[in-house]
Curated annotation (Swiss-Prot):
InterPro entries: PLC-like_Pdiesterase_TIM-brl
GO MF annotation list: lyase activity; metal ion binding; phosphoric diester hydrolase activity; toxin activity
Main location, first listed in the record: secreted
Active-site residues, as the UniProt record annotates them: H5, H41 (nucleophile)
Binding residue positions for Mg(2+): E25, D27, D85
Tissues with expression: Expressed by the venom gland.
Family matches, as CDD domains: GDPD_like_SMaseD_PLD
The keyword Thylakoid appears for this protein: no
Name of the protein this chain belongs to: Dermonecrotic toxin SpaSicTox-betaIIA3
Length: 275
């Protein structure tokens, strides 16, 4: 999965897809009551990027629904995963449950259309810190109460704050979640980062019987050398400001026969086992 990073303006969706992304990450900004208002990152953000691009969240969902709905004039088959970077650290953790309710409701109304010609992409809920776990409860409770638990099959969970992997597992156990789990590791492109935690996550992913990590990706990679380093470790995905650079690295002799771009036919919740 090549994940376009910080794709917060509607016009950026096709821009990043044209550069080779098959997944996009966008930031969800909440008001003080946990209502999802805008796709917006804000200052500071990655070096060399404009931090202030934004859209109304529901309008953004309406657009990506069209882009991921077969038969729609705007359909792009390559877009298979939407990663919602939930800026919950900006609101009280007491509002995390309400935020989960609101995001689930808006996805039902504007993306899935409650079963009427909705978008098909998989959804990854990027949660900054384990203390915000109530978001997941609010989200799942809403799907159940609204009679649309079928969409759980399309939804995954990812804690993105580089916290202790065993602490993340404990929270997932507490929630009763042991599938559809991704693990991110990374830092803003402005700073270097080693691979210790990334390698630990990959080791857990590859441990037979370990349920709490099915995919691992590294973020935010801008240098080709760091992309190569991550690919050599066998990551499942790379988040980048420059998807075209990732495409270029994947075409190199070392990687061309080892990796391919994920398509809609690839289940993002299953571990990929090399033969």
């Amino acid at each position: 999965w090549i994940m376009g990073h910080m794709v917060n303006a509607i016009e950026q969706v096709d821009e990043f897809l044209n550069l080779g992304a098959n997944a996009i990450e966008f930031d969800i900004d909440f008001d003080e009551n946990g209502i999802a208002k805008y796709t917006h990152h804000g200052i500071p953000c990655d070096c060399g990027r404009l931090c202030t691009k934004s859209a109304v969240f529901t309008e953004y969902l309406d657009y990506v629904r069209q882009v991921t709905s077969p038969g729609d004039p705007k359909f792009r088959k390559e877009l298979v995963l939407l990663a919602l970077d939930l800026k919950l650290q900006r609101i009280s953790s007491e509002k995390a449950y309400a935020a989960g309710v609101d995001v689930a409701t808006k996805l039902l109304d504007h993306y899935w259309k409650r079963g009427w010609n909705g978008g098909r992409a998989y959804i990854l809920l990027n949660i900054p810190l384990v203390e915000d776990y109530e978001f997941i409860k609010g989200f799942k409770d809403t799907l159940r109460k609204e009679g649309h638990e079928q969409y759980n099959a399309k939804v995954g969970i990812n804690f993105t704050g580089n916290e202790d992997l065993d602490e993340i597992r404990k929270v997932l156990e507490k929630l009763g979640e042991d599938e559809h789990i991704w693990q991110a590791d990374g830092i803003t492109s402005c700073f270097p980062r080693g691979t210790d935690r990334l390698e630990k996550a990959l080791e857990k992913r590859d441990t037979p019987g370990y349920k709490y990590i099915s995919k691992v990706y590294a973020w935010t990679l801008v240098r080709s050398s760091i992309m190569r380093r991550s690919l050599r470790l066998d990551v499942d995905g790379v988040m980048s400001n420059y998807p075209d650079r990732v495409v270029g690295v994947l075409q190199e002799k070392e990687f061309a026969n080892k990796f391919r771009l994920a398509t809609y036919a690839d289940n993002p919740w299953e571990k990929f086992m090399r033969i």
